[in-house]
Amino acid sequence: MPASAPPRRPRPPPPSLSLLLVLLGLGGRRLRAEPGDGAQTWARFSRPPAPEAAGLFQGTFPDGFLWAVGSAAYQTEGGWQQHGKGASIWDTFTHHPLAPPGDSRNASLPLGAPSPLQPATGDVASDSYNNVFRDTEALRELGVTHYRFSISWARVLPNGSAGVPNREGLRYYRRLLERLRELGVQPVVTLYHWDLPQRLQDAYGGWANRALADHFRDYAELCFRHFGGQVKYWITIDNPYVVAWHGYATGRLAPGIRGSPRLGYLVAHNLLLAHAKVWHLYNTSFRPTQGGQVSIALSSHWINPRRMTDHSIKECQKSLDFVLGWFAKPVFIDGDYPESMKNNLSSILPDFTESEKKFIKGTADFFALCFGPTLSFQLLDPHMKFRQLESPNLRQLLSWIDLEFNHPQIFIVENGWFVSGTTKRDDAKYMYYLKKFIMETLKAIKLDGVDVIGYTAWSLMDGFEWHRGYSIRRGLFYVDFLSQDKMLLPKSSALFYQKLIEKNGFPPLPENQPLEGTFPCDFAWGVVDNYIQVDTTLSQFTDLNVYLWDVHHSKRLIKVDGVVTKKRKSYCVDFAAIQPQIALLQEMHVTHFRFSLDWALILPLGNQSQVNHTILQYYRCMASELVRVNITPVVALWQPMAPNQGLPRLLARQGAWENPYTALAFAEYARLCFQELGHHVKLWITMNEPYTRNMTYSAGHNLLKAHALAWHVYNEKFRHAQNGKISIALQADWIEPACPFSQKDKEVAERVLEFDIGWLAEPIFGSGDYPWVMRDWLNQRNNFLLPYFTEDEKKLIQGTFDFLALSHYTTILVDSEKEDPIKYNDYLEVQEMTDITWLNSPSQVAVVPWGLRKVLNWLKFKYGDLPMYIISNGIDDGLHAEDDQLRVYYMQNYINEALKAHILDGINLCGYFAYSFNDRTAPRFGLYRYAADQFEPKASMKHYRKIIDSNGFPGPETLERFCPEEFTVCTECSFFHTRKSLLAFIAFLFFASIISLSLIFYYSKKGRRSYK
C-alpha cells in the first residue's frame, strides 16, 4: 500500500541574519499573517540581489520533498468514444466549426499534428487511454515520487450524474493506479480538469447552475469510494479562474460561452461551493479511513510595479487579488472575497452568506499552486494586470502566498513552459525554464523560509494544448501525433529533470568550487584601454613669438614683429595627459598595459606620404613612460572601431579589407610603428579582435595576409634588435551546446566555434588553411565564397605567432532547433540562446566563468600547448556605479577559472588583462569611474589590485613562492647597465677629485688668512 501523506514539516526558519534584518526593517513578520501582508513582498525584492545570490544557487531540497510530473485527461487520453465514454464540453468545443476569438488551435501546426483542414481536437491526442504501461514506464524513467493525473468525469459517468458508472472507465483508472503502486509512485488525482460532461452542460447550463455542485459531490464520492484507498492527494478543481472567466465570460475555452463578467463571477461562486462540498465530504466520510489530503489547484501570474510607489504596489496587490486571491482568500482565510474585489465589483460580485463563508473557509489541506504559461502569459486578461508588468518570477509569488495566506504548505502541482510545435526532442528553452523555476523554488525554501513540500513538472508528454491546439508542446516526452504507436521519446528536459531528481536539487559540484593557488612569478597582470586617451596638448607654452604687455592702454599682449625665440626641444613631460594615466596604472599595481594605436591618426592618407609625428611622439612617450615605471606596454596595431573600421579614410573608401592593397598598406604601417616604437614595446598585437560575425570571407582572407606580412616584417627586420614578441588577438567566447544530452547540439556548437574562432585561428595556429568544418559546411550549401590560399600563402600565414592571445567575455548556448526566429541563424542553422538562470550584466551579457576554462582547453586541444594570454576580459556595469559588485564577482570567478586552467589542466597561461581601464574611454566597463574630470577607483579596481598583490588566490596550504622583483629593461639605459664596473670606477675618481679640490681650496684660503 502507498505510504500515508507525510506529516507537516516544521516550518524552516529564514536562514540568514540579513534576511531577518530585512523583515524587521519592514515591520517584522507576525506569527500569524493576514490578508494584505503580501504587499511586503515587492519591497523585500526591490533591491537587486548580490551577484552570488542572483545566479546559480547551489543546494538540495529537504528530505522527503515530493518530485512529481503531471498530465490532464482531455489533453492526453484520447479514446474519446471508446468503451462507453460520454462526450465532454471539450469534445463539443473542439468539434465546433467556429472557434472563439483569440483561438490559435490550428496555428503553426507541427509535422505530425492533425490536418489543419480539420479542427484540432483531443480525440486521439497522446492516446494514453490505450497506453498505461507506456506512460508509467516514462514515470519510472524519470524517477518521480508522484504522478498527477485527472479523471475524466465523462469516462466514469458518461451522463455526468450519479448512476451506473462506466466499468471500462473505472477499470482504466484502477489499472493506472495499480501500475503506479508497483512502481512506488504515489498518485495526485484531479477530479475536474476542465472537461465537464456535455450532458450536464446541456441540462443545467454547466457551472452557471448552482445545482452542479451536488452532481460534482456525487461524482467525487464515486471516485473516493473506488480509488481513495490508493490516493493520498486529491485536487478537486484545476484552475477555477480559467474555468469561470474563459469558459463563461470570454468564451475562449470550453464551453465557449461569451457571457458577461457577471456570469464569470457567478460561475466562480458555484465552483467554490462545489469544492467546499467535496472537501467536507472527504473530511467527514473518507479521511478517517483513507488518510489523504484534499485541495483546489489555483493558478496565478506574478506582477511587478512599474514604479516602486505605494500606488503601483497597491495595483499589483489588486492584480493578484483579482486572479489568485479571488479563490484563495475564501478557502484559506475567511470564506469571503478580497476587499479590493468587493470594493470594485460590488454590483456584479455575488455575496456569500455567513454560513457559506464558514462552509468554505479552511477547505484545503495544502496550497496547490499552478504557475506557467497557460495563465501567466496567455490567458491573463490585460485589464487584470492593472497597468503593471507581468514577470515569470515564481520565487516572489511563493513569498507573496506565504505572507498573504498565513504560511501554508505549498505543493506546486503544475509548472513548466512550452516550445514550438515543430520542436522535437531538443527542447532547450523548456529545459532552462524548468531549471529556473526549480531553482527559484529552492531559493524560496532556503532563503525565504517558504514551506514548499513538492514540485510538479508539466507535463509528462506532449498533448493537446487547449486553445493552442498542437501549435506548442509542453511535454517532457516527445509524441509523434501521426504515428500509430505514439511512442514516448525523452526530450532533453526529461533527461535534465531525471538528473535533478536523482541529485535532489543542485548540490555543489567540485568543478564549481574555487581553487586556491597562485600564478607563476612572471605572470603578466594587465589592464586594457582599446581607445587610449590621446591628448597631444603640450603642458608648456610653445609659441616662439615674443610679446609685450601693453600695461597702460589696451592691457593686451602685443606681438613684436621679427623677433622669435629659439625652438625648445619637446619632452614627454610636455604631454599633460600621460602622467595621470601612468599614475592610475601604478595605483592598480599592474605589470602590463595594453592599448591600441590609431592607424588613421598616424597615417591619415594610409601611407607614409603624410606621417603625424606628433601622434607618434605621443605614443612613444606613453610607451617609454610605462617602461620607466616598470609597466610593460602591449600595443595593438589595429583595432576595429568607428569610423571606417579604424582604417585611414582613403583605405576605407577604396574597399577597406575587401581590397588586397590594404594588407600591403598595413605591413608598411606596421614597419613604421616597429621602427618608431619598437625600442620600448616588447609585446605586439597585429590586430585586436577582428569580429568575424560581420566580416566577409574576402575581407578575412586579406586580413590574415595582412597579419602575416606584419609578422614577417617584425621577424625579419626588427626581432633581433628589439627582442620582442608578436601575435594576433582573437575574440574567443565559448559556445556551449544548449542541450548537453544532444549530439546534434554538440555538432552545432563545434561548427559555430570553427566559424567564430577557427576561421582566423586555424590558418595561423594550425594547418595554414581554413577549418575543414567550415569549408565542408559551405560546400554542402553550394556556397563557394570562401577563398583558397595558394601554397605560398599557406606557408606565409602558418606559424605567424609567438603566443596565442584571446579576448573572452561570455558564453553562448546554441541549439539545433529553430525556436526564436529573431535569434536563429539560418546561415549556420543554429539557434542562439542563454540559460535564464545565469547572472547577466545590464546589457544582458551572461556571466559564465567556467566558459573561460573550457575555451582555453579547446584551444589547447586544437593548436597544442602554446603560451596563451587572456588579453581582454571584462563586463559592463550600471552607469556611474562606483560599488561595482557585479564586476568584482566577475573578475574573482573568471580569474579563478583561469587559475584552474593553469594548475589543473596544464594550460601554459602567461597573463590576464582586465577590460577596461576607465569609463572615459569605455563607458560602463572601466575599473575607474570618470566624473567631473576626475578618475575614481571602483570596488573592482581595489579587488583586482588585491588579486595582483597576492598573485592569485593563495590559501593556508598554498606553498609560499619567492618572486624576485623584476624590472622592465630600459632601452636608453642599456649603455649604463652593461658598464656598471667602469661607471663605478669613474664615479669613485670623480668623488675623489671633488674631495681633493675642496681640501686644496680650503687650505689655500686658510694659508692666506694666517699671513694677515
From Swiss-Prot:
Residues 1-33 form the signal peptide. Glycans are attached at N106, N159, N283, N344, N607, N612, N694. Its EC number is 3.2.1.31. The keyword Cell inner membrane does not apply. GO terms for cellular component: apical plasma membrane; extracellular exosome; extracellular region; extracellular space; membrane; plasma membrane. Residues 1003-1012 are cytoplasmic. Residues 57-506 are annotated as: Glycosyl hydrolase-1 1. One of its GO terms (molecular function) is fibroblast growth factor binding. InterPro entries: Glyco_hydro_1, Glyco_hydro_1_N_CS, Glycoside_hydrolase_SF. Present in cortical renal tubules (at protein level). Soluble peptide is present in serum and cerebrospinal fluid. Expressed in kidney, placenta, small intestine and prostate. Down-regulated in renal cell carcinomas, hepatocellular carcinomas, and in chronic renal failure kidney. Residues 34-981 are extracellular. N-glycosylated. It comes from the Eukaryota. It catalyses: a beta-D-glucuronoside + H2O = D-glucuronate + an alcohol. The chain crosses the membrane at residues 982-1002. One of its GO terms (biological process) is energy reserve metabolic process. Defects in KL may be a cause of chronic renal failure complications. It is linked to Tumoral calcinosis, hyperphosphatemic, familial, 3: A form of hyperphosphatemic tumoral calcinosis, a rare autosomal recessive metabolic disorder that manifests with hyperphosphatemia and massive calcium deposits in the skin and subcutaneous tissues. Some patients have recurrent, transient, painful swellings of the long bones associated with the radiographic findings of periosteal reaction and cortical hyperostosis and absence of skin involvement. Belongs to the glycosyl hydrolase 1 family. Klotho subfamily. Homodimer. Interacts with FGF23 and FGFR1. This is Klotho. It comes from Homo sapiens. The gene is KL.
